[in-house]
Amino acid sequence: MSRTKKTRRITDIMPARKADKKPEQPKLSGGKNRKSTRYELDAKAREEKKKRKHKGLPTGSRNVDPAEQKKAAVKEVKDPRIGSRKKIPLMVEFVNKPEKGQIIKPVAMEEYKPHLSPELELEQLENNEILNQLLDEIEAGKTLSAKDQKFVDECLDRIDELMTELGIQDEDEDNGDALLRQFETMDINQFR
């Protein structure tokens, strides 16, 4: 069954709406050249004023320049981000989410080591004030913290590597080896 739009019919029971009433026209009696009375002119002016009042035109429509009309015709490009209904996550999680059963291995960062010539690096390590101060404390019999001891060990190991790379031999090591050999070969009975 098709639907039909219901219309409001004016009957005797219903009150008449303002829009349904037709304005009463004053009856003109007499000749064509007869002047309207003051009351007729007022009624006519009131009707015209009502018509003007309810036209619905925007204010100042008479004063619009044609150049401004062209500008108004060009639509401004709206930013598509404004007024979006799509929900945006506030916290980004699982940017590189692996497939099920797969694991993304973390990439190890390589430490950057400045490439100095071995001679320069050895000279810098030998002239390192902090290292020299820590070595003096060790010779004095003080105990170092774990962090300082690790630093001293790393520096001394690097010095040894650089010296073997450059072919430099420490004089103290030769004397120590000679003394060790002398001690091992010595006859202990001589000192009794």
Swiss-Prot record:
* Keywords (A to Z) from UniProt: GTPase activation, Ribosome biogenesis
User: Do you know which Pfam families this protein is assigned to?
Assistant: YihI
**Source organism superkingdom:** Bacteria
* Region of interest (Disordered), ranges: 1-80
InterPro entries listed in its UniProt record: YihI
The annotated regions of Basic and acidic residues compositional bias extend over 9-25, 37-48, 65-80
One MF term in GO for this entry?
GTPase activator activity
Gene Ontology biological process terms, A to Z? ribosome biogenesis
Subunit (UniProt): Interacts with Der.
What is the documented function of this protein? A GTPase-activating protein (GAP) that modifies Der/EngA GTPase function. May play a role in ribosome biogenesis.
The similarity annotation says: Belongs to the YihI family.
Q: What is this protein called?
A: Der GTPase-activating protein YihI
The opening ranks of the lineage are:
Bacteria, Pseudomonadati, Pseudomonadota, Gammaproteobacteria, Pasteurellales
